[in-house]
């Protein structure tokens, strides 16, 4: 149906295009831009060479010479230069250039370029000559709005010139204007270039930076002078954290939750923080499930077809957060090994039938996984344990580790402790093992895994240091990254720690004295830190904000967090991802001119994106759910880098791109340092935190679209009515914050310290209430649509209802197809997919993991609002029916009815959420 519709639409478009009048497209063919950088230089006593910068869409150029009355065309050329010969000696000639392109067989010309005037080479020193060089006494000006400055020009040679007249121009008159004498007037914040042009097009330029007059402008300007040295420091620190094997647990570079390497690195970072000059440096202990990988290998002993004894040694092996053979004990020295394909229940059953056995006791299973496109590691791992395998050895078949077939990969396991080893090898090593299995005889495998894991038995350290505030506000701003890693982890996240320390260094070196505390945190246990949950990452940060420093809740103005900040994936735009309510702060900073003297790393600058998709996959989630708004740079279109390098040994300090996926960029690190140092200083310098709750209202409004299909019209109308009133309150709240900040700036400009202090006090009071409201939004409205996407509670259910409804419709239209059968896979945040692949035991465990039924406290607790826990049973039975070859629609009615029952349950829950959210809007309105 959709393909047919697409074809019809495409045909209609093609037909409409072919029937358009001939001139239709010509209307869009506007004239090319006029040539720029036109110059006229004497070549001989009778010739002058003209040159110019071309226009991007021009086909050619026309040269015009002044004949005493008008400009006459003397040459048409495709080149960007022309030499006019046979000229009279010592006579001055004037020229202009036009660009042209051809549209519908006709030439369309640009406007004239500016005029250039020159003489051929002088026949004697007494004759006039051309300017050869223009020199300005200043090549850069830094000004404030309203200020003026003089640019003085000198011309070379010093003798008689055709004319000494100079034409002055500004690249942006809205930033700075220049008069005919070279007097520059700063108009508005920004950057522009002033050009002095001589008669023949020879120029000199001066860059103008008009600074904002905001109170934090001077501090930020000073800071930017120190980013170069701080970047060198950040690069060295990032490299040390990645490649110093004394700070790793094994030869591949692992540094995981509560491990010896984490502890050593915490000591190292605490020392670095002190050397930078941070105050109150501490190592804050947090409880995690310990994981320390030390070593793993496997040896296959077998006989080849000639009966010769052979050995295959697999040394390139790492372990997931699962038990090691050393820790479990027992004999792993002579095990069978079986190729189990993708490790599904059906493949095990087929193996049992073929080999006349009932389980995998005494066997290692070899399983291929694609954790990008297919299924996470928890499914194959749990299924292997259910089938009583001695161990599972996995390898990538797609998605991650795509760099090459000799690349290892590692991810968080998102599973219970199944008391069974689970390791990862390369695809090429898997091919070697398969070859032995297929062609060898008497194959026996010895597996050795030294991997220490345990539940609530580990201690990780978050390393903290601060630049103390001077205003005794009781508030703070956090700047953070994590230092645990897989393999080298150069980008993820060693360079991020380097950047955090670099920001601290550049602030301290520049003499910055914040009003609020600026707290720098190196988190441990971000990659993994908890068994028995699908939300097993960001545990170090969760423990920090909930157990170690719960007092940070309500006093932390923002978290600025970093993940892989130095990867250049060739984007024209950088992205500042933010919690919805603080996106406006990022936009205001970028528009403020505070970074006018910092060249953007990105061609089209940085865009701000309200984000509930990427932030939850980082430490930001722990803080956001506890009332702290978050910022984080994150490039778009980085998927190929992630597929090739993320969580592999290829996450390294590569600066030469051989895969088209991206490189490490020191220049990007320096830009991030300037931008996000400025962000922290900007937030610090504005007494009132300008939270825009109307941005979150946009989220609420989008969430209610389509809800009337499942909730009463009255309840939806009440929701929308309350939302309209909430918008009014949100607008007033933001205006109040802006007024406080405007009062502060006015007092600053007036030099009124008393009024500045009063505005600061008003800001503290405002922030206390605004952060309470922000936390209330997180508590009352926001849930998880799956294990990593934040969504409004009722919308989580609505997403699931839409899927159930789609399944019911497909099963009820009288024509059952395989596509119909697979629609249900997306239910419950894609966890329903397990019903097609795995045993009842695994499906039960996966739903427990999704719903966090066995973990009392982590950021996913009580947040997963979408699931009907047992719908997988219906899906599994439906799929079994299909696999029996049944296509009779009547046979699927029972499943459609069961799905309708789940929908009824979800509708009741959704209705309750719509009601509770409507009530919460009333409360939130009063809080604002």
Segments from the language model and where they lie:
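Metal-dependent peptidase/peptidase-like ectodomains
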Residues: 523-643, 724-792
